[in-house]
Amino acid sequence: MAIECSGRAGRTGGPGGPGAPGPDGPPPARVVPLLALACGSSVATVYFAQPLLVTLGERFALDPALVGVIVTLTQLGYAAGLLLLVPLGDLLDRRRLVTGQLGLLALALLGVGLAPGAAALLVALAAVGLLAVVAQTMVATAAALTPPARRGRAVGTVTGGIVTGILLARAASGVLADLAGWRAVYLVSAAFTAVLALLLRRALPAVMRSEGPGGAPSERPGGSGGSYARWVASTVTLFAREPLLRIRGTLALLVFAAFSTLWTGVARPLSDPPWSLSSTAIGAFGLAGAAGALAAGVAGRWNDRGLARRTTGVGLAVLVLSWLPIGLTGRSLWALAAGAVLLDFAVQAVHVTNQTVIHAVRPEAGSRIIGGYMVFYSAGSALGALGSSLAHAAGGWPMVTALGAAFSLAALLLWAATLRTAPPVG
């Protein structure tokens, strides 16, 4: 994929000048780290509520068995954004798309922070999910700005920012909620998101449009006049035609169902006796999964060396094993911390591998492919969130653990079943 860049001082010649970012040269040093920061901040908004579920449920009088709907609606909004907004990354100027969505995300966060009742809260959270998909457009942007030989590292760096954002989301959310109330979490995030929009407007190339191989314009469904509806529908067509995309998407659904099962459900046993932890302490457990950020970078380097299949298998095996210590949460917080480290490491290793592998299938359709893949991610997260709440109501933490382990084992078995198929899953 080539990137057309123009309108920036100091870049002349060719599509974007010899100093322009793209497959033939590295992006400016500050762009990928800034994209990583913005990705992490955007995705964090989806996870702020996790350590606050008990607080929000009590504040807005939600049934304990259905408190997971807070996360589920946010994830459903995210899924809608993946289908409706992410494909625009292959159609429009990505700089305007990224900065515009960040600005709207800031407004949605403001709406959450000022919500007067449950209905307004849930609508605003769905809007946050819808607009937080800007992170996936930024992943595709980072991949497009980087030469193929270094693309795995760039995707790993940006995905590492996402992982770090998820982890810090829980910790920061808990701390701010204890210090200034839960509303402060969303109001501070709204201001930070607005600042990032301004910074990226200055840092990204003035014009960024996807192109096909050899610099030709990227394929437009229905020709150059193809409608937006056809463009969105083409995402479904891509997954219907490419078995590798469907396999990797299903793996994402199962892996993130397991991920969401843990992080949606864990607030309840930690806030109940014998632990009775505060929001700050509950959020701090998200830091136990900091290994996930390390996994993102390691997986990116392994993928650049052609080890995607091995990375997938090891990651899924570790994911299954992580539920053994997680199941001991009622007896030991150290066991939960150890299990969270293993789970986050495994999930992010598989996630980075998935994104690197699927982008190579059709580079000129990178935004649509990543958007379609992340629909599976979001569906799995919504399934895990709702399933976790229902499982806890039915059988407590042991039932939640069993559900998460079942999702993880299903992913490992799917990967094993496809080892002898063509194309391989990694």
What are these model-derived regions, one by one?
Residues 125-162:
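Cytoplasmic helix-loop-helix junction between adjacent transmembrane helices
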Residues 190-212, 414-418:
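C-terminal membrane-cytosol helix-exit motif in multi-pass small-molecule transporters
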Residues 80-118:
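Conserved MFS/SLC helix-loop-helix module at the cytosolic interface between two early adjacent transmembrane helices
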Residues 81-93, 295-308, 392:
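Helix-to-loop junctions at the C-terminal end of transmembrane segments
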Residues 17-26, 205-249:
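Juxtamembrane intracellular "pre-TM" segments in multi-pass secondary transporters
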Residues 156-202:
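Helix-loop-helix hairpin linking two adjacent transmembrane segments in secondary transporters
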Residues 309-354:
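C-terminal transmembrane helical hairpin of 12-TM major facilitator-type secondary transporters
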